[in-house]
Amino acid sequence: MATRVEVGSITPLTAVPGLGEMGKEETLTRTYFLQAGEASGAPPARILEAKSPLRSPARLLPLPRLAPKPFSKEQDVKSPVPSLRPSSTGPSPSGGLSEEPAAKDLDNRMPGLVGQEVGSGEGPRTSSPLFNKAVFLRPSSSTMILFETTKSGPALGKAVSEGAEEAKLGVSGSRPEVAAKPALPTQKPAGTLPRSAPLSQDTKPPVPQEEAGQDHPPSKASSVEDTARPLVEPRPRLKRRPVSAIFTESIQPQKPGPGAAATVGKVPPTPPEKTWVRKPRPLSMDLTARFENKEALLRKVADEGSGPTAGDMAGLERPRAASKLDRDCLVKAEAPLHDPDLDFLEVAKKIRERKEKMLSKPEMGSPRALVGGSSGVTPSNDQSPWEEKAKLDPEPEKAAESPSPRLGRGLELAEVKSRVADGEAAAGGEWASRRSVRKCISLFREDSTLALAVGSESPLATPASPSAAPEPEKGVVSVQERIRGWTAESSEAKPEVRRRTFQARPLSADLTKLFSSSASSNEVKYEKSAELSGEFPKEPREKQKEGHSLDGACIPRSPWKPGTLRDKSRQTEQKVSSNQDPDSCRGGSSVEAPCPSDVTPEDDRSFQTVWATVFEHHVERHTVADQSGRCLSTTPPGDMAHARVSEPRPRPEMGSWLGRDPPDMTKLKKENSRGFDNPETEKLGPTTLLNGELRPYHTPLRDKYPLSENHNNNTFLKHLENPPTSQRIEPRYDIVHAVGERVHSEAISPAPEEKAVTLRSLRSWLSLKDRQLSQEVTPADLECGLEGQAGSVQRASLIWEARGMPEASGPKFGGNCPFPKWTGGAVVSSHKATVAVSEEHCAPGATSVRAIKAAIWESQHEGPEGARSKPGVGARGPPQGCPLDPLSRATNGPSDSQARTHPDAFAVQKGPFIVAAREGDPGPAQVPQPAVRMRKAGAMDQRMDRWRRRTLPPNVKFDTFSSLVPEDSPHVGHRRTDYVSPTASALRKPQLSHYRVETQEVNPGASRDQTSPAVKQGSPVEPKATFFAVTYQIPNTQKAKGVVLSGAESLLEHSRKITPPSSPHSLTSTLVSLGHEEALEMAGSKNWMKGREHENASILKTLKPTDRPSSLGAWSLDPFNGRIIDVDALWSHRGSEDGPRPQSNWKESANKMSPSGGAPQTTPTLRSRPKDLPVRRKTDVISDTFPGKIRDGYRSSVLDIDALMAEYQELSLKVPGEAQERRSPTVEPSTLPRERPVQLGGVEQRRRSLKEMPDTGGLWKPASSAEINHSFTPGLGKQLAETLETAMGTKSSPPFWALPPSAPSERYPGGSPIPADPRKKTGFAEDDRKAFASKHHVAKCQNYLAESKPSGREDPGSGVRVSPKSPPTDQKKGTPRKSTGRGEEDSVAQWGDHPRDCGRVPLDIKRAYSEKGPPANIREGLSIMHEARERRREQPKGRPSLTGENLEAKMGPCWWESGTGDSHKVLPRDLEKEDAPQEKERPLQQVSPVASVPWRSHSFCKDRRSGPFVDQLKQCFSRQPTEPKDTDTLVHEAGSQYGTWTEQCQSGESLATESPDSSATSTRKQPPSSRLSSLSSQTEPTSAGDQYDCSRDQRSTSVDHSSTDLESTDGMEGPPPPDACPEKRVDDFSFIDQTSVLDSSALKTRVQLSKRSRRRAPISHSLRRSRFSESESRSPLEDETDNTWMFKDSTEEKSPRKEESDEEETASKAERTPVSHPQRMPAFPGMDPAVLKAQLHKRPEVDSPGETPSWAPQPKSPKSPFQPGVLGSRVLPSSMDKDERSDEPSPQWLKELKSKKRQSLYENQV
């Protein structure tokens, strides 16, 4: 994408010798314009063809506009030439020109390829012309990641949309077809434009979405491709996918592009993409391209710093356009950014169409089709070119093959295949090229500048090139031959390109991570906040960034400095937004990528441009992979040097491309580079200082981007000083890993692999910081295992290596960092750099968190250094430090092997090897299966997740989740862990910051404990760390923003995103006992991601491997809530109490999970650490203040968690303790966590049992009960566990993870997993995998939403959720099994649904994400209602959770009611009570609606599957039946929607928040009142109603009304005592039918109300009167009046009223308000005209004789209440009926309240 094409670095890049060539192509620096050009897709090729760097630059500026035209193939070449030229900065000399012919040829094909790639990768990564084209394709992967984000995610479309979007949409043409079409539409609808506007957000959210979708790109890009073109099943390619994983971003975007154009699978998405329809647009894009490129480039530069756009642009256009376009396009892209975004989407679509046409056409269709259609086959061909190109074929093939599974895991097997073929050849070739990389490094050194340019761009080029090459191979042999010739010419560049591919892969991971972490969570928040606003970090930062990012090429240093600060903020946001360095690298890197270009130019100018060029992550990653990879591959012997070089490079790279995302990271990385890199030898002190300074540096480094600049200069210069080329390359390589680790850190050379692992580790290590301890053992294995888990695994591997390596690296960071320092500081540097990156990514919202993390790292380095270094030095240190590689291998054999094997088998390693590493021996087989399964399941999930992401602009978190998770189930799990790691790391960064700064030194062991859990968590939930970094960043952001919604959204998104992978994970789990355990745990981790509550749920799953819960639970919880403490305490408790068992289970689980080696080790480690962990967690929780604050903020914002907590504490002091622990975990953590471990264990077991139960029926239930009882050891724990279990059972299937898991999970880290682990793993694993996959997906969505909320407010999870559980415990204590049985039934039914929900969940996600769209929401709501009805029916049997429901009523009447129609129905109330805060938060966040909807939808998967439409129909029909009551109900419903809803929401929110129980009751009671005062409420309740509306509206008006009716019903029932309320709610569940009707009514009512808005006041009055009369004379008349009145009264009452009106009009025309009451009287008595008359006369006389005349003035006064009053009267009876129903329990006071409220409202209205 042109956006990132800027690599201000091109100028500095030009400084590089090879960049001298690039020098001509200073435009290359501007190349980031290319994205626009590449938007055309062909322009890259054409530009490649035109290739005159000068002309390219000249054209580059126009090309942005021409880019779309070049997209036409003719201009395409021209556009690409400038873009490609710059992109070709590195490759252009070596392969740029050579590639030019191929690029030309490719251009013809490449319109789709480049179009796709440009659209997808935007070709910025296409370091060379062909690379532009091919790399565009590969950048397609990278960009596509962005693009996929664009397509899949709103951001992607947006980010890609930015100027680069032209190119990207060009790619989008291919990929957007898949992703853009969904993503574009989704993007646009979902908020693509918002993201688009903030291209950074565009890129970032896209990246997040694309990171989610393309970090998942391996999975999510795959998902997009899989989603868009699931047909790209060539799962066989899955192996390649890992290479593609790198590419997956580059390739995946490609794949979607070609897939869309060529691949039918992709094409189907393409049609939705309407890329073809917009095909003409490419010309427009050509015209617009320039502006788009400029505007988009500005945006994209900022954004692509943020996302692939920047990366693409940076890679292709940045080099090309960076110089020129950077200035021109920076300016122009900035202005057209939005245009390109919107226009670009259109143009991109057109380009896409055109490209797809071209792709469809013999050429493009063939290449892309080959990529997409022949994905499986062509990858080989693709590789063939790559083989030719990069002698990397064997390894590319191998790596591609291995990556394919990994990527395939990314779900994008087909995509991976095509991409792997295309990009995997590049990625695999690149990875395999690691050996080739050494050649490449030689080439890279030759091409050093070129390679740097190409390295950064070549990796991009690699993705594109492989894509291009494969495409020619595929589509057109001549093109293939051209590509081959191009490869031959570009042979050097190609290897570099492969490196780039490497970056592409990292991008994938980065994007996925970013998505997962930032896109979903922080991206939604930050990215939405920041990026949505043009990427706050990006647009504001982009301004600065535009200084450095946009102007990065133009103003490399200066912009970088502001960019640094900006990047810092933006990186924080990008990190927050893309908590995973990927997004950081992508979002931040987009910013920083140009910056790194600027920064790196001094050292690695080429790869600065390259970094910027490649993709944020792709470029960075590619550069890292190419340059670092090469160097690393070359330098592996000198592990230290390697690490050092790699690390210096990572510093530069990080500084370079991270320079963008984390200028701070660049600084950090550079500082790390400089302090680590050099400190490895020269800067052990600096490394430590960096650690010490990391925080200053992290924070300051960002701010000190000048330092970063200096560091860029110094670091890069130092890198140059060190090994200018080698070190430069390697550092960048490692940085890529740092990013890659974030992303997919797959471009690890043998030694760099360790480095990459280190950096990868870093990414996890971010999260793994806390994880490091646990990770030192498990993460190594897990790391390996995760790495074994397909593309995501690569990233997971990076993360696992970050966890395992951070086991080695994290400890290296802690102990290992010092160790690496001693080992060479390279690891430390890399780790630190990665940490910086990771930290940055992880701490999207926590720049200070990053800084704190730096401090934490420092502390870990220095403080935990000893503790961490000791355990981790040998085990972790080695993986981290290349010198430690052998040791690491010994200790972290899998991790190190991964790392070591990575160079050759990096891709393969990721799949098999990492599987082996991860699973030990079984891992490889198991992991691949999960990978495959995940791919399959993930494909849909990813697709859906992508949809989510796409639709999720508001809820970008989901994007992250979906994208992230689907990447591959193991990967997803790992990703989840990674997400959790980053999120937790983000929170934990703050926590770690606080705690680790405080506790690290205080509790180095504790720190390590945190790390250990983190590591362990990281193992299963690796991606979670990254993801959750974002999530936590979101909490941070939320805290900062006070956007509970965002945080919850983030969590939701994470949860959602993670959820889909969860299902793949579950599938994977099923496939592999160990694998599935890991998958489940990963799913659990994903669940953790889903919410910190989900985290608890994840702990449930993760607890299966007790290690996991400890790491995930302890770690995740710690960051999010006291949960970490919980987990720590749990782990300590578990370690001590359940120590043997948890250890066994955990070991089993861990081993099953495939931390086998690490799990056992980790188990002991964790076990030993948990004791520290409690301390650390305590401290952490104390330091969790920040997260706790966030949590508290969540709680406060989401729901009056304090009130809830008070009640919750009362109800379940232990649970509240848990929540309190989170609040003040310091005191309780040790005690409560230990109790809770059992509790949670029991609950988790119970829940797991419940989850299993569907499979194992009552077996698990009893076991679960027994275990829960066992877990109940703590009395309250038991209650809670039971309650949780009940809640779990009740909400087991949909809210299984939603609420119960979080609360239980919080408790069950210790208890449940122990006993339930093995069988739960078995039964639960399989069934849960299925149901967990589908339901998890659903529950993920739901639980994201539900748990995301709690996640946002973990206390809500622990407090609110526990609170609900606590009450259910009271209620269900005796009936936990009942609840469980019902939950079980529900679970079974729901799980039965959920498998379908798997497919449905994506839709649900779509719906959820398009919560804006009432249809999906309505469908969702209808299905939810349907299911809610079923659930309500079921609920009676599960009514034991009455208390839960009461709690729900207390906690979340709003959500409750909004969710009541959903999963709330079964245990909705109980769980949703818990979720109520979530829902409240949810309403706060639009995600909440989505959360609510998907959650419910998931709950009502069945209904939703058949129900959404059926329910809609039912609702439609119901509406008619409700019509009679609809006059009444309509008003009420309208009131509910407008006023009642709002009132309910307000009441629910306020009351639920203030007094959950009474509030719920009040809210429930009030809903009728609200309806009565619909007019009054109409305006007033909007805020609460908005909450409600968030969930309701998201459910659609129908859903709203179903909820409203439920509310009414519930409200009517709810008003009854809490206990009665739940019972009534049971009855209310039947109201779901009414709810459906009410929904319809609500819609009709809304219309009518809008029509009779004036009447509504009177209606309100009438209702008030009715209520008044009801209150005064509550007689059956009300019911009769209600019934008769509905029919009779409408006619009879009208005449009496008219008569009365005439009479009373004279009597008191002025007394309209009083008449309201009399009217109400007549309304109820109205069944009898005479009686009505008498009563009306009477009442008007009594209340206000003149009010009845109001009926006559009815016609007179437009507002005359009495026409509506008649209707209102009629309506009132309905309300009255509702009131009576509801008020029977508490009629008078509620009625009075309602009456008064309505009166006041009416008076106000009057």
UniProtKB/Swiss-Prot annotation:
Miscellaneous remark of the record: Antibodies against KIAA1671 are present in sera from patients with breast cancer who developed several autoantibodies.
Region (Disordered): 38-131, 158-282, 299-320, 355-431, 456-604, 627-696, 860-901, 969-989, 1000-1019, 1134-1178, 1216-1265, 1291-1493, 1512-1627, 1642-1806
Keyword Phosphoprotein annotated: yes
Residue ranges with Low complexity bias: 51-70, 82-100, 456-470, 1753-1764
Matching InterPro entries: Tankyrase-bd_C (IPR032764), TNKS1BP1-like (IPR040006)
Keyword terms: Phosphoprotein
Natural source organism: Homo sapiens (Human)
Highest rank taxon of the organism: Eukaryota
Name of the protein described by the UniProt record: Uncharacterized protein KIAA1671
Biased composition (Polar residues): 514-523, 889-900, 1142-1166, 1537-1568
Biased composition (Basic and acidic residues): 226-236, 386-400, 412-422, 524-549, 564-573, 641-652, 661-674, 969-978, 1169-1178, 1244-1254, 1317-1331, 1393-1410, 1426-1437, 1462-1483, 1522-1531, 1667-1677, 1689-1714
Biased composition regions of type Basic residues, renumbered to the chain: 1649-1666
Modified residues annotated as Phosphothreonine in this record: 378, 600, 1059, 1163, 1179, 1185, 1226
Gene Ontology cellular component terms for the protein in this record: cilium; intercellular bridge; microtubule cytoskeleton
Modified residues (Phosphoserine): 52, 56, 79, 87-88, 92, 128, 244, 284, 366, 384, 404, 458, 508, 749, 969, 981, 1063, 1154, 1224, 1366, 1441, 1488, 1506, 1555, 1662, 1701, 1757, 1760, 1786
